[in-house]
Structures are given as structure tokens and as C-alpha cells.
């Protein structure tokens, strides 16, 4: 599901003012997501936190919002836990262009008794994205976490397509250049401006 609130942020990249976005599946229903089958945490630690190595191929189980027919209507699948899961076609076509900012690792998506080849995307670059003074926080067991939605900084730089926040590995943004790449290659990914 898409969040009801978002914020617009202009990104200053080499003199250009750009929007930042979150990405979503083009299959828009509340049950369109996939759960990671493995429970050991090593895949999550590697993809999201850059810890360890990618030794076992991730397997995702699609929930009832995806079918063997409508899975071809999207090139990005939301996952639980939160990771980037892209279609095989997207990855083969754009991996070289995105190689400085995204690494891709093979994964499987199971829909009932069918398997589809997908790829996990691992964001390589971290940048100061969140305005730590204006954002709200919550605590769990004495550890402080950024409350969502965060307030983003007005001038963000240091990347072309996507980055994760330097303080929170699960806050990601995608720039206009990424959106233009998706649109010009006719990929099916939805964009929500963080405005």
C-alpha cells in the first residue's frame, strides 16, 4: 500500500533541481507483496546492512495479490522484510547502467507452484538524506529510530540514481534520472514523489 503522506524534496545534483521518489509495484493492491522464505537473517543483513556475503539465493513467496499473469505487469515487487526486488528483464537491461549505485543478486519469486527469476537490488551508496533536526524519532529498548515519514534535507548530492540514508539503511530515495530510465525503457514501476 502507498503511504497517505509524503514530502517533496528538491535534490541539487550538479546544478539540477530534482525530485526524489519512493518506488512501488505497478500491481496496485494491498496483497501485492512477497515474503522472504528464509528466516536466518543473513540475506537481509547482506542486502540492507552490508554485513556478510550473499551465499544462498533468496526465495520469496508471493501473496495473493500476485498471480502468474499479473506478475508480468510489474518490474518491481514490494517485499517483507523491506528489500528491492526487480524483474529479470529490468536487471538484464539496466544492471550495467546502474552498476555504480546498485548491485544485483539472483532471487526466486514463487507464485503458487511456479517460479520466476528476479534479482535483489543492493543500494551501494549512502548519503545524508534525512534532516535529523526536523524529523521525529521513537525509541525501542533505548535505541533511537527515525519515525516515518522522515523530513528530507533540501540539498542532497553525491549520487545519480538512488541512495540510502547514512543513518538509516532502510530509507531509500530514487531520483528523476532513475525514473526517466525506467520510463524510457518501458519498465513497469510506480513512483511516489516524496513531496
Residue ranges and their predicted role:
Residues 89-99, 181-185:
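Short active-site loop/helix that positions an aromatic residue
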Residues 76-82, 89-92, 103-110:
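Short secondary-structure capping micro-motifs at structural edges
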